[in-house]
Amino acid sequence: EKFPVRDPFFLMIRRSLNTFMNAFTAADWTAYPFATQNKKDFQNLLSVYLDAAFSANLNPLDFAQEGIRIELENGQPVYKGVVFNEMKGAMSAPSDQLYHQLAHHLFPETTYHYNSGGDPKDIPDLTYEQLVEFYKTHYHPSNAVFMTFGNQTAYELQEQFEKLALHKFTAGTTLYSKPEKRLTAPVEVTETYAVDGDELKDKTYHVLSWLLPQASDIKLRLGMRLVEGVLLENSASPLRHYLETCGYAQSTGPLMGVDDSNFEMTFYCGVQGSNPEHAESFRDGVLNVLREVAAKPIDSSLVDAILHQIELHQREINGDGTPYGLSLILNGLSGAIHHNDPIQIWDVDSAIAQVKEELQDPMWLSNLIQTHLLDNPHRVQMTLVPDATKSAKEQEAEKARLAAIGEKLTEEDKAEIIAKTKALQERQDTPDNLELLPKVGLEDVPADLHIVQGQLREIICNRMDTPLNLYHAGTNGIYYQQVLIQIPDDVVKSPYFNLLSILMGEVGAGEYDYLELQNLQTAVSGGLGMGASLRSKVDDKDKISAWLTLTTKSLTQKFDAIHLLKLAFEQLRFDEKERIIELLQQRKTRWQSRLSGAGHSYAMQIASRNMSALAQRDYQNTGLGALNWLGELVTKITQDDAAYDALIAELKHIHTKLLQAPKQFLLVCEEHQSERLVEEIQNVWDKLNVDTAATELTQVEQENDNEHEAWLIQTNVQFCASAYQAVEVSHPDAAPLMVLAAYLRNGFLHSAIREKGGAYGGGASYDGNACSFRFFSYRDPRLAETFKDFEASVQWLLNTEQQPHQLEEAILGLVASMDKPGSPAGEAITACYALLHARTPTFRRTLRERLLHVTLEDLQRVARQYLIEQT
């Protein structure tokens, strides 16, 4: 109404300093969250969001673009639409097919029965009139929930809600979720999912699911969280242990534990990498474990350990991905939507007090397992089996449907379709009047980049002075401790190096086997981790800055996590053969199942693999070829003892080299706790058992790949990428290249690839680690045409008149992402890692300053130099 533009959401992303903007659709709610640190920006976004939500212009041509339409190609009808293609891509993932097919049976009648994103085979049935009717019924204040977090008062905000949107409405109908009709006996079903190729062995999923009572019962909700912890928290937990070691599956499944986000709770457990004939063994095995656990009291120390995890999770201030306030809002949203009190979800102290009272009865948790799992008839077992013909059948069904439509089309119908297609193209080509929308400008950008400052201390590690990076932060009673180890060059390039991080904390250490170590971690820490922080050198693309990170966190009264981290690394055990093979098998299976969601990342990685030392290393160690290598390795070590022994020898060599390598420490905590924690770290790490003998690593021959490649994965859409050699991040041209990527995305690629091409997403990016400039598309129905659009975007920049606001918008988005706040601990850890990789505060501020001063001439110059002249 107030902002009659075609796409207020994408246009406001560019005209804002937002730290988060998105829209989420669930089975019984849709949310429109946004966040910003700038008050003017908040007012702008609030006014546009309220106008879009409550006074939407639902243009039938926009429905055709975003939802579904028919166009004619060579005189024959074809389906097009952004969401249609998005859901084709989303439903390619086996985990999505598993969830939606299971929900279909677990919820026979309620809204959860349906795929809220839209099943691709049903989307063509949706009409514009149905969309408008749905909007009128649901998008009414009587059916809305407003949640805010920040320093504006509730009164002030409510006044704005009223003034900007709500005053024009009268009372409407409030919609309520309904309880599901309960099954009177368990159900067993078999469904299929699409796979490529004829090899169907070890590709079946088994899952058991139960429908539980309403999530509004806060005590039961926490009780079932404890049940989940007892059964599934770690590899020593009885149900997870059974599923990981059952012998008929390669890994636990993607659906595990309690889901309390719906009106009624559910409990899941399952396996993947299995075969159909094991369905009965799976069901009987799970039920036997549940019977064994429910038959006796649960060890109180185990319950205390799970309560420790709940307290740790409750205390932790996150916000490194989604802003902290929005995380809280989204956690409480399902409660509020279902007319419950979200404060009970955020503040679990009262629920913990109630639960502790119930725990006076040693059989309380055991009885919950008996009542809500064993004696609960609303149970669905699903066997999801691979079908190599399913994709072809779905495509044939779509073709047959379109052919039937085509046969009935009269010349008049065809003329109408052509006219609508032309009208949509004209609408897409007509620039919006941006003056209608509010904006912030470069004058609203903070003058300086906020960077957390730490202290550099020294402690004794292995009788040597060793740096300790200390950061004081408001961590709400939690400390974060890390060991940072400079990774030798031969180690970082070894494909075996990544395997070591899979083992750390998951195999035994010292006198503890892996089951004992798992339980210890749950009792005293938020887990133990090993990872790698890798960057290209700021001024040399042929060198890698590489640090190993050993990580833990815990409540400040639990120092044992510091001891446990050292033990798990220093005395990591390589003698648990079955466990090690099991962990590598799990990694391979989970990696395979996640491919279709990250196709654009793999495409960009492949395209830029030879443009820096780090790009080459990442492609060889984490790319699609590395997945094939891991699969072959798992097969070899399972069948051949000598191959297994060779693997362990290699891992031991890498472990020794890392023990020998130079170290630093990182501690993030509240100031009043720091001296005790520093002292404890020194006491623990003073003596380190290091084998000083030199070790040599095996050189693994890497294949020399082609310049142009296509990889086939199981999906009904494409992920396209082109890459061009660019410069190191310290080069003055890095800033213009960053702005160029945003400029081309906003000004050309979004329209060409998403709006006109029908892909769910697309754009460009400069990658300072790969030292490359990359174009990409995501869930894209096209192929060759998209590559032409990549090239056309450069010609558009060089050969058409450009508008000044486009440059400002591109710079604004980049600066907003640089200035985006994290959690208190996350900002400290980021600052420390930046220093390790020579991204000093001066370096970061210089880059930001360069971004703010990029000109249109700079963009045209770097586009010619890097995207045309080297082609």
What are these language model-derived features?
Residues 44-48, 52-59, 74-141, 160-164, ...:
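Scaffold signal of the M16-like zinc-metallopeptidase fold and its non-catalytic homologs
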Residues 1-45, 51, 62, 92, ...:
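M16/MPP (pitrilysin/insulinase) zinc-metallopeptidase core fold and M16-derived inactive scaffolds
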Residues 198, 254-263, 286, 471-474, ...:
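A glycine-rich, aromatic-flanked flexible loop/lid motif
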Residues 34-79, 263-319, 334-342, 359, ...:
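M16/insulysin-pitrilysin zinc metalloprotease superfamily fold
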Residues 84, 88-96, 173-238, 322-343, ...:
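His/Glu-based metal-binding/catalytic segments typifying zinc-dependent metallopeptidases
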Residues 69-75, 86, 90, 178-197, ...:
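Short, conserved secondary-structure transition motifs
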Residues 360-400:
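Extended, domain-scale alpha-helical bundle/helix-rich regions
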